[in-house]
A protein has these predicted regions:
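Short, Lys/Arg-enriched N-terminal segment that forms or immediately precedes the first helix
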Residues: 1-14
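N-terminal helix-turn-helix DNA-binding core of bacterial DNA-binding proteins
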Residues: 11-48
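Key DNA-contact positions within bacterial/archaeal DNA-binding proteins
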Residues: 51
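Short, hydrophobic-biased segments on the C-terminal half of alpha helices
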Residues: 57-58
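A short, conserved structural fragment
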Residues: 61-71
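Basic, amphipathic "hinge/linker" alpha-helix immediately C-terminal to the N-terminal HTH DNA-binding motif
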Residues: 72-90
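C-terminal regulatory/oligomerization modules of transcriptional regulators
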Residues: 113-164
Length: 164
């Protein structure tokens, strides 16, 4: 979750979720092997105008979540990576839970709503319930949790990936 500092105290829930959506989009674009992310790629991924994206990137940069250099690109800072990693993990775990445990086909809007409000404990419980999966339904890596996926869990994950 984005930290609640004195200046962030007045950020509403929708604004926090919107900021997290940008961080998630940047993570996913970087995950595709790109060294930097371009404003146009974020605009396309989130179906937003370039000026809207630039405005949010300036805000994320000012808060220390990204490094945004006009004309060059965007990178996540360690602070931004922590949040993006959590959101991506939550999203991918929720997709798997919906598909495997509930039998409900993946619904992007529902999954997106859950990812912002899922506690670390809930994410760990879902991860454990699913057998510590390494990949989501799309074959993308699921980031490991902060206190989840211990060494023995990782061995279990690797065995399930290889043999089951």
């Amino acid at each position: 979750m984005i930290a609640r500092s004195a200046e962030d105290h007045f950020i509403g829930e929708c604004d926090r979720e919107r900021m997290e959506e940008y961080l998630e989009a940047i993570w996913i674009l970087l995950e595709q092997g790109r060294p930097l992310v371009r404003v146009s790629w974020i605009a396309k991924r989130l179906s937003l105008s370039m000026p809207s994206v630039v405005e949010m990137l300036k805000s994320l940069d000012a808060r220390g979540y990204v490094t945004y250099t006009i004309g060059e690109g965007i990178l996540l800072t360690p602070k931004g990576k922590t949040i993006a990693r959590r959101i991506v993990r939550n999203h991918r775990l929720m997709e798997l839970l919906m598909e495997r445990s509930i039998g409900v086909p993946m619904d992007e809007k529902s999954t997106c709503g859950f990812e912002h409000h899922m506690s670390e404990g809930m994410a760990q419980a879902i991860c454990k319930k699913l057998g510590h999966p390494t990949e989501c339904l799309h074959g993308q890596k699921i980031p490991t949790g902060k206190d989840c996926c211990s060494r023995s869990d990782k061995i279990q994950r690797n065995q399930k990936t290889r043999w089951g």
